[in-house]
Amino acid sequence: MARFLLGAAAIALLAGVSSLLLMVPFAEAYDPLDPNGNITIKWDITQWTPDGYVAVVTIYNFQKYRHIQAPGWSLGWAWAKKEIIWSMAGGQATEQGDCSAFKANIPHCCKRDPRVVDLVPGAPYNMQFGNCCKGGVLTSWVQDPLNAVASFQITVGHSGTSNKTVKAPKNFTLKAPGPGYSCGLAQEVKPPTRFISLDGRRTTQAHVTWNVTCTYSQFVAQRAPTCCVSLSSFYNETIVNCPKCACGCQNKKPGSCVEGNSPYLASVVNGPGKGSLTPLVQCTPHMCPIRVHWHVKLNYRDYWRVKVTITNWNYRMNYSQWNLVVQHPNFENVSTVFSFNYKSLNPYGVINDTAMMWGVKYYNDLLMVAGPDGNVQSELLFRKDRSTFTFDKGWAFPRRIYFNGESCVMPSPDLYPWLPPSSTPRFRTVFLLMSFLVCGTLAFLHNHLVLDKNCGKC
C-alpha cells in the first residue's frame, strides 16, 4: 500500500511539474502593459470549388504598441492533408515546392508547409487584394487600426469540399520579421464571419471560420537589447549616459561599427551589407541602434517640463511608424505633449502611469538613419501634484521606456541626477535652524556687550 501511495505521489508530482513546464511559454508571453494584446489570424472559407475551396486569410495586429516593421510578416503552416495552393491574391508563397506531378495548370505552391508573405506596394492590380501590398508592415492598433490589418486570398485544392470533410491547417508560425511569436491551434468560430457589401445593403457569410491567436514573448525572441536610455536635468550638471555595452561591446572586428566622422563612412554604409537587417551602428560605448534621452528641462510654479530626444545610431534602417512607451507616475497630470501623438495606455485600469507616443504623420513619423537628420524630439509639460511632486531622488525620471515594443536598457537608479544637497528639504531645515541659532547667539552677545558697557559707566 505504501509503495502504491509513493508511486501515486511521484506521478502527481511529475504531472504538476509537466503542467508548470507547459505553462512557462504562456507566462513569458504575458505583457503587463498590454495583457490582451495578440495577433489574430482569421481563416474564412468563402467558396467551395470542385476539389477544395477559396479562403480569405486576415491578420489583425491587436497589440497596442508593438508593430511589425520591414521587411514585414511571414506566415507559415502545415497542411492537415495533401492540400496544394492553386493561386493567391494579395500575397505569395515564398517557395513553389515540387509540383512535378502536375503536367498542366501548375499550382502556385505544392509544399506541405508553405510560407506566405505580403506583396510589396505597387504590385500589379490583378494580383492585389483588400488590405494587401504593404510589404508586410503592420502598425500597432493604437497608432492606426486601419493599417494594423492585412489580408490575402488563397485558392486551395486537394482538400475537403464541405464543412464535414475540410480540415484546418496546423502548426502555424508567424515571423514579424524574426522569431518571438507563438501561435496556438486553429479554433473553429461559430457563427462564421459575416461580410457586409460596400453599399451596406447585403450580408454574406463564410462557410467555415477558423481563428488562430499568436502572442509575443521576449523570452522566445531571445533578442539582444536594441535601445538604451540616457538622462540629464537642469538642476544637476551630471549627464547620465547609456550603460556601457548596453546593446553590445565594441570589438576589433572590421565593420562591427562605424565612426561618425570616418572618411570611409559612405563606402561602408553602401557596401556589401547594404539592405541587411543586421544593424550597422555608430561606434559608441553603448553600441545601441537607438538612444532615448530624457532631459528635465524647466521648473515652473505649477508645471514642469521635459524634453525627449530619440536618436538613431543605425546606418542601415529608417524606423517608420516608430513608437515610444514611457512609464512615469506623473502621466496622470500630463498637460501638453508637443510634436508627438500621445495616448494613455492605462494598463492598470484607473492608474495612468504609462503613455504611448509616436510621430505626427508626414512630419516626424519617420526616424531617419544615423546622421544629422537621424533624430526626433518633443517636449512634455506636466502639471504639479503637490502631494506627490518632487525633484528629489530621481523622481522626475522614467521608470521604464520601450521603443517599438522592446524594453530599453536603463541606467542604474543610483546614478540618476539628484538634486544638489543644498536643495533638499532636510538641508533647508537644518539651514534654517542654524540660521536661527546663529542669529540668537549674535543677539545674545550684542545685548550682553551693551549691558556690560552700560554697567561699566554706573
Curated annotation (Swiss-Prot):
The keyword Ribonucleoprotein does not apply. It is found in: Membrane. Its main location: membrane. One of its GO terms (cellular component) is plasma membrane. InterPro entries: COB_C (IPR056900), COBRA_pln (IPR006918). One of its GO terms (biological process) is plant-type cell wall cellulose biosynthetic process. Keywords: Glycoprotein, Membrane, Signal, Transmembrane, Transmembrane helix. The chain crosses the membrane at residues 430-450. Glycans are attached at residues 38, 163, 171, 211, 236, 318, 333, 352. It comes from the Eukaryota. It is a single-pass membrane protein. Residues 1-29 form the signal peptide. Belongs to the COBRA family. This is COBRA-like protein 2.
